[in-house]
Amino acid sequence: SLWRKIMKGLMLGIVGFCLLFSNTALCGDIDAGEARYAQNCGNCHGPAGMGLASYPKLKGKEIPYLIDRLNTYRAGTKIGPNSDLMIMMAQPLSDVEIANLAAYLNAQK
């Protein structure tokens, strides 16, 4: 579909930009993301984002999806059964921390 082609092009553009410029604020630092994940996320989402019980698997998810979800929770929007907890966990995160988390989780294939 046209939408899928647009999204694929956007994703390739983001990846290309990151490879060319390695800007941590846009691309994320995997090591910093791993440290933040261990501190904030691992107890519910499991080791390396594998998912536990009612907490979804995050491992290998696309970066734009992860950033969108964390930004949505950070804004206080409820989008799932664990929204209250996720809002509380996401609100203190900076844009850089969100990018780092997304980079780490995406790298867990």
Residue ranges and their predicted role:
Residues 1-7:
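Short, Lys/Arg-enriched N-terminal segments with co-localized hydrophobic residues
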Residues 8-10, 31, 67-68, 107-108:
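Predominantly soluble domains enriched in secretory-pathway, periplasmic, or organellar proteins
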Residues 10-16:
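Sec-dependent signal peptide hydrophobic core
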Residues 22-23:
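N-terminal signal peptide c-region/cleavage motif recognized by signal peptidases
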Residues 28-50:
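Sequence/structural segment immediately N-terminal to covalent heme-attachment motifs in c-type
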Residues 31-39, 59-68:
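Sequence context surrounding c-type heme c attachment/ligation sites in exported
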Residues 52-59, 74-109:
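Axial heme c-ligation environment in periplasmic c-type cytochrome domains
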